[in-house]
């Protein structure tokens, strides 16, 4: 059974057809500009199916979700196609990818917001139930970069980041960031998919407001990450 057949069995023909339309848009645009290295079955497996399964244990209908550096829309757009009632916002700094996401939004008649800019310049005071990112940066950098995007009240924002087989080493390197940024790790969840790859979700919240010096400017975060 290929990935499309598996998706059809799990989510129905209508949803599978919309995901197929999304994949075709990616493939067409990838011929013009390099949007993603995923193609063929890898696009379906790692781009589409894995994205859905990573978010599925956490995000429910009507939850608000912020996806940082989504690129062509992974992991949030495939999940939105399956769960159209999710309130999605995407931050993407690459203008070509933003234009592609706008085309996806129009052609598939999806409802989501796109912010074209860097995450540190996103200063809208909006509560998000969940914040996610995939393949954007090491965990200690992600933690600082996104510290001001999450809320404590009226309920804590859940940070859920997609990581690979080296998730434990990233988590160990982030221990000082966890202390300084007053975070609490809730869960390390292994995502089981039908192909041979280890995917883990690191789930945490922030427990208190932190010093105004955080997050630092991007160049300082990169040059001297919290360790």
From Swiss-Prot:
Its EC number is 2.1.1.-. S-adenosyl-L-methionine binds at residues 69, 74, 119-120, 134. The keyword S-adenosyl-L-methionine applies. It is an enzyme of class 2 (transferase). It comes from the Bacteria. It holds the Pfam family GidB. Keywords: Cytoplasm, Methyltransferase, rRNA processing, S-adenosyl-L-methionine, Transferase. It is found in: Cytoplasm. GO terms for cellular component: cytosol. The keyword Metal-binding does not apply. One of its GO terms (molecular function) is rRNA (guanine-N7-)-methyltransferase activity. Specifically methylates the N7 position of a guanine in 16S rRNA. HAMAP family: 16SrRNA_methyltr_G. Belongs to the methyltransferase superfamily. RNA methyltransferase RsmG family. This is Ribosomal RNA small subunit methyltransferase G. It comes from Mycoplasmopsis pulmonis (strain UAB CTIP) (Mycoplasma pulmonis). The lineage of its organism: Bacteria, Bacillati, Mycoplasmatota, Mycoplasmoidales, Metamycoplasmataceae.
């Amino acid at each position: 059974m290929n990935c499309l057949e598996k998706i059809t069995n799990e989510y129905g023909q209508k949803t599978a057809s919309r995901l197929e339309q999304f994949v075709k848009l990616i493939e067409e645009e990838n011929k013009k500009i390099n949007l993603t290295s995923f193609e063929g079955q890898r696009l379906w497996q790692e781009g589409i199916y894995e994205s859905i399964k990573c978010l599925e244990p956490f995000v429910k209908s009507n939850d608000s979700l912020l996806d940082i550096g989504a690129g062509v829309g992974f992991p949030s757009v495939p999940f939105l196609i399956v769960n159209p009632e999710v309130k999605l916002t995407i931050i993407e700094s690459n203008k070509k990818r933003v234009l592609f996401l706008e085309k996806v939004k129009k052609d598939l008649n999806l409802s989501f917001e796109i912010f074209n800019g860097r995450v540190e310049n996103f200063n809208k005071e909006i509560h998000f139930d969940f914040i996610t990112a995939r393949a954007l940066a090491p965990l200690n950098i992600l933690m600082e970069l996104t510290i001001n995007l999450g809320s404590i009240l009226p309920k804590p924002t859940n940070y859920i980041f997609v990581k690979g087989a080296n998730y434990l080493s990233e988590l160990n390197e982030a221990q000082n960031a966890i202390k300084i940024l007053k975070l609490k790790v809730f869960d390390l969840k292994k995502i089981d998919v039908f192909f041979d790859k280890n995917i883990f979700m690191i789930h945490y919240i922030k427990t208190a407001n932190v010093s105004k010096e955080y997050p630092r400017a991007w160049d300082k975060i990169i040059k001297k990450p919290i360790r």
